[in-house]
């Protein structure tokens, strides 16, 4: 298997609290967007962006590596079997630019898909995940707690998201 993915599919507005925090409606179906392979970066390399691009927000995300093909016929019950590994990632967003693009009704790619905007930690074998409904994670920046995540709070559970993707 190639170590470089053919595509990176992301889920926006996946947590009700975060959608409301940004003034977005809670979606009736998953909001998907993509990042190109050039957006990938290793956490070991650190995080950087051009400050001239504006304010950059980061969100810690549970990240799944899909090792088996998912099709339109894949149902949620079988979708989890396609996952080969998990990690945490940072989804970087040029928030001012994204807000401007949203107001104009334009796509978000310029704000979400720039080089280095998908920062990943090392992969962990999927066997380490004991309960997909309760994967808990935190993000600390300089020893300060910035984010708490838990799959129990997702609008759509992991299996449903995978089947939809």
What are these regions (language model features)?
Residues 1-165:
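Catalytic-core "active-site belt" of small-molecule-metabolizing enzymes
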């Amino acid at each position: 298997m190639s170590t470089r993915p053919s595509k990176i599919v992301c889920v926006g507005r996946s947590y009700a609290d975060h959608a409301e925090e940004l003034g977005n409606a809670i979606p009736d179906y998953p909001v998907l967007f993509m990042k190109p392979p050039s957006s990938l970066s290793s956490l070991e390399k650190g995080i950087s962006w051009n400050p001239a691009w504006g304010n950059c927000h980061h969100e810690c995300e549970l990240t799944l590596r899909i090792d088996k093909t998912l099709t339109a016929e894949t149902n949620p019950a079988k979708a989890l079997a396609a996952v080969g590994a998990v990690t945490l990632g940072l989804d970087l967003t040029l928030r001012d630019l994204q807000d401007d693009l949203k107001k104009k009704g334009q796509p978000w790619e310029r704000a979400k898909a720039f080089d280095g905007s998908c920062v990943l930690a090392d992969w962990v074998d999927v066997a380490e995940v004991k309960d997909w409904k309760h994967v808990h994670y935190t993000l600390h920046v300089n020893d300060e707690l910035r984010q708490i995540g838990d799959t129990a709070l997702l609008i759509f559970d992991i299996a449903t998201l995978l089947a939809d993707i």
